[in-house]
Amino acid sequence: MARTYEETIYDATVDAVNDALAQPVLPSPDEIKGNILDNSRNAVTMYNSIAQQGAKWKVPMELETYQIAYIMLHVHYIALIETTESEDDADCSLLGVYMEDGEDEGIYTTKDSEVRRIARLYKRRITYKEFQEMMYIMREEAPRVKRCSERNLIAVNNGIFDFDTKTLMPFTPDKVFTSKSRVDYNPNAKNVVIHNDEDGTDWDVESWMNTLSDDKGVVTILWQILGAIIRPNVSWNKACFMYSESGNNGKGTLCALMRQLVGEGRYASIPLKDFGKDFMLEPLIRATSVIVDENDVGTYIDKAANLKAVITGDTIQVNRKFKQPISFKFKGFMVQCLNEMPRVKDKSDSFYRRQLFIPFTKCFTGAERKYIKDDYLKRKEVVEYVMYKVLNMNYYEFDVPEVCKTALEEYKEFNDPVRQFMAEIMPELQWDFVPFTFLYDLYKEWYKKYVGKQEVKSLQVFIKDVLNLLKDYPDWDCPDSKKAVRPKNMMDKPEWLIDEYKLEDWYSTTYKGNDLKKSVVRR
């Protein structure tokens, strides 16, 4: 049976690639390219020797697109990396190439620029159209793989660290990582002391961490957070919110250390307000952490779904400019620095459970040492010790100190006026039965007094919010919010809040005297 030109060239490519892979040492790209062209030319010449005039084939002078795709798929480690746990749509997966050397050694890079760089080793002047065609071929034929999800395995700069056994293993294409820390794991790392001749001070990272808070529990959890940002396979299910209304408190310097641990290009800087915006989440694809040391004052988050999904590792849609959107599960940890607590529309307990507030109460104004951030935290021996310390700790959950729990409760009230209202008012109520209409009128006046503007929340929404929070007040219940209830004598006591908030509609309708005690009894 007569063979086509494409079939002949394909067979010549397969033979040359197989010969290359059989060699003790893989030939260079130029050698592989040359052997394929030689095989192809020989096959074409043989065909042309017996072909009739006008039916002869053109002798190839450079590789065809499908030949380059074949080389890429068989000489290099090319894989289609699934970005979610679903296997339904290969079009939403990322094409990655395993890097056997260079700064990305041991991980799969999904950058088109890196794939193009390798393709140009076989055809220097590959066109945009040819590159896109090659990518389509590889997407169809590349094996599909899953990102490594073993929570004990961590990709550091010089290998894969097993957190459980505390051992360093070599990289392998079978363990699919798309990112790694830029810091080596050094089992001999020590906490070095750095002396500054100019001001006569000595500095070491252990002592410096202790200066960030007088609360030992806070220092401990800060070390745990440093570890969390390089352990992306652990489902922490929380995001860290480092909070202080004043500057010069160490937050920014600590973030600089985090970035040194993760490495340039391996963290995303997405402020809270951008999680609901289009095209702002694409940096997550190649990141293992989100580190933001500045959020706008007065930030209001209307749509928190993406933020919650990123924190919990649920699937989100990532819209990419000029590319097809993909479904993506972010694996990593988030740190956001705040100078003011953000207001979020989502006031559910499921959202609050994801928040780890860490108050920074120290102030280093007048005692700043900029060289800590600009010099010390960039030194190899310093970051290698930090890496060594956090990888030799033993934890899969955070040890949350009381001060952080208190900060979260304060934030809940700050973010939710109804919660704050109930915390203040419920213990003060005198009546044993409180109509929702009374509580709503009281809330509106309280809101004007303490928030300073008119509340627009409707009665129905208010009732819903109250019922959601009522579980925090075991002395109160509401079996059926829609059922009419006769108060009988449950409203006979004086309700002093009527007078305090001047609820004119709730003063007694039968008593006309000046006795306050009688005027605030409902009749």
Predicted regions: what is each one?
Residues 2-93, 121-523:
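Feature primarily recognizes SF3-like P-loop helicase cores of small DNA viruses
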Residues 107-122:
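Trp- and S/T/G-rich repeat-edge/linker motifs of beta-rich repeat architectures
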Residues 91-108, 159-161:
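Short beta-strand segments and strand-loop junctions that repeat across beta-rich extracellular domains
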